[in-house]
């Protein structure tokens, strides 16, 4: 018999004060028909693929680490459009509006041929292959081997006006009442940090701080054994209320398990057996071997694969092709606040490592009679080549109270850059100014000079690219500009000395009837 009961749960009331709504930039940004093309130089970097090379004292960095598995984070600096000497001053009213940039398209160019890179460790913790074992595994004091493999294949780029947010797992601080012994596994936690230029990407071993959590220094390859592998925190960036960190992104990852190994060393977490709770777990996970058998002493269960990125093909490339931004995933639809843009790139499909051999002894190569390996020094180098092109649209921000209130809550420094800060009334309109302030006859100058504007990303490492003098209105003179004009049926016109883009319609011819 069904009986109705009143709800016993809590009654939730709406908040007494309304929650501030964040507007999309499309609701208050006014776009113009003026477009600029920006492009960088050919960006090159050369280094060692696995580690930094220092001199014998350790004070001088001789060769930096440059790996195809690293993140490249480009910080593009754009000119301030409010300081432009526009030929047509009717474009905007400086008393009521401010100009900003909007990204409408970009192309990330990549040089160098496709290639598969190899990484590894000369003392890799690989006890034995567990996929096709023909005898029971016995461990010794040191079972490390010289092992190499190819990393997971990854192509990815993330575009925004703030740095990309990454995530990784790191050692956590345990509770005081549960303070553990240093010999036991520490607790771990997920940490969120900015991805900087040079941070390693995941190559198949996860996004982990290997420096803190793998003290054997033999569980992963050389290029990440002393590093932290980061992965973009797409969940956090997609739910960002302003959407500045990620306008859009493109990603392609692939891998498969090529080899299956087992770790050597003492097992930290034993398989539950008869020793627990007076035999409750006896024969629950395994049945012990007989006396005299190798299986009497159970082996290690620390299984892991080494992955492979498999085929590298030009048919699945994200680079050297244009991308157009019509609608961003967040509230910021491509507006480049503070006149800067961040592009985070990972591409290990061009991961070839050069091998360079140099004759070690005095004399010429023609004087060598017999080959001896000790006569030659072997070096490794990796190179990266980039080129970035942008299509920028000039936009206007109305200086209205509700718009300025949201911008102030988002980033108050923007209003200071626009010279809209509050200016207090001076107490005394007459100030003292000395002529020879540095001479011995006058007092010392102020000990606290005016403080310069501090970089909000001070201390973070980026690849700075200055585009302040790399803008052009002649879109048809550049490859990406022509693609932008043609793909939407646009044409470029000049009005009052200012070049703008207008729509050019296409008319289809009348289809002729086929004769019967």
UniProtKB/Swiss-Prot annotation:
Pfam families: Late_protein_L1. One of its GO terms (cellular component) is host cell nucleus. InterPro entries: Capsid_L1_Papillomavir (IPR002210), Capsid_L1_sf_Papillomavir (IPR036973), dsDNA_vir_gr_I_capsid (IPR011222). It comes from the Viruses. It is found in: Virion; Host nucleus. GO terms for biological process: endocytosis involved in viral entry into host cell; virion attachment to host cell. GO terms for molecular function: structural molecule activity. Signal peptide: none annotated. Transmembrane segments: none annotated. Self-assembles into homopentamers. The capsid has an icosahedral symmetry and consists of 72 capsomers, with each capsomer being a pentamer of L1. Interacts with the minor capsid protein L2; this interaction is necessary for viral genome encapsidation. Interacts with protein E2; this interaction enhances E2-dependent replication and transcription activation. Belongs to the papillomaviridae L1 protein family. This is Major capsid protein L1. It comes from Human papillomavirus 36. The lineage of its organism: Viruses, Monodnaviria, Shotokuvirae, Cossaviricota, Papovaviricetes.
